[in-house]
């Protein structure tokens, strides 16, 4: 028996057992969609770092993979993320978006995921995702607060069970002012949005 025949038999037997995987990957002769691998190497490495951090976070790790990718792709493409590293290793990250009034309501009250065209729809700055599975949350918040160009930032806080959400707002009157922290329940935040309209 020749080596090629042995190799063919091995491949045939293996593929029979692994056929479900082959069917899950699409047609091998079809090219990948246009722009499928268009991210620069640095951004692909950053995407991997963010996936790693999410997988290590007890709060984030049960998200479906497709949801994680969908949540990270737009801020990655827009460079609206920051990864915090220690000794070269990723330790935390956050993503942000600038939302208009109606998108704030959809995101914070209706809990609708942001569409890519909504990430820069307005001037209201939101931290969309934040993961610090190694205990660096205090350092991340301190670094965010040091940004004197922003006077107000909002984020959604969910309890561990994911059954309740609150809007947390960091606000200062001017670049040198103290930062006030306000927490809004859903109805309180609706009233706040109505006052701002």
Model-derived segments and spans:
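Short linear motifs in intrinsically disordered
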Residues: 1, 69-75, 143-148
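Short amphipathic alpha-helix that is part of the acyltransferase structural core
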Residues: 2-68, 188-197
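Cytosolic beta-strand hydrophobic patch enriched in CBS
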Residues: 81-85, 154-156
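Conserved beta-strand in the GNAT
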Residues: 83-98
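Acyl-donor binding region in acyl/amide transferases
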Residues: 101-178
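Hydrophobic secondary-structure block in the mid-to-C-terminal portion of proteins
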Residues: 171-197
């Amino acid at each position: 028996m020749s080596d090629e025949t042995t190799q063919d038999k091995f491949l045939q037997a293996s593929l029979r057992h692994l056929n479900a995987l082959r069917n899950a990957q699409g047609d091998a002769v079809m090219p990948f969609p246009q722009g499928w691998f268009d991210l620069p190497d640095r951004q692909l490495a950053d995407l991997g770092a963010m996936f790693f951090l999410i997988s290590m976070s007890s709060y984030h790790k049960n998200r479906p993979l497709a949801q994680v990718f969908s949540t990270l792709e737009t801020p990655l493409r827009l460079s609206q993320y920051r990864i915090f590293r220690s000794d070269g290793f990723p330790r935390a990250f956050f993503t942000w978006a600038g939302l208009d009034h109606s998108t704030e309501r959809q995101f914070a009250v209706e809990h609708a995921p942001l569409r890519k065209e909504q990430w820069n729809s307005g001037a209201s700055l939101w931290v969309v995702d934040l993961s610090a599975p190694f205990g660096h949350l205090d350092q991340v918040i301190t670094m965010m607060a040091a940004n004197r160009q922003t006077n107000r930032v909002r984020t959604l806080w969910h309890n561990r069970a994911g059954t309740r959400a609150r809007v947390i707002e960091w606000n200062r009157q001017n670049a040198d002012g103290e930062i006030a922290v306000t927490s809004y329940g859903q109805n309180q935040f609706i009233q706040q949005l109505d006052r701002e309209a």
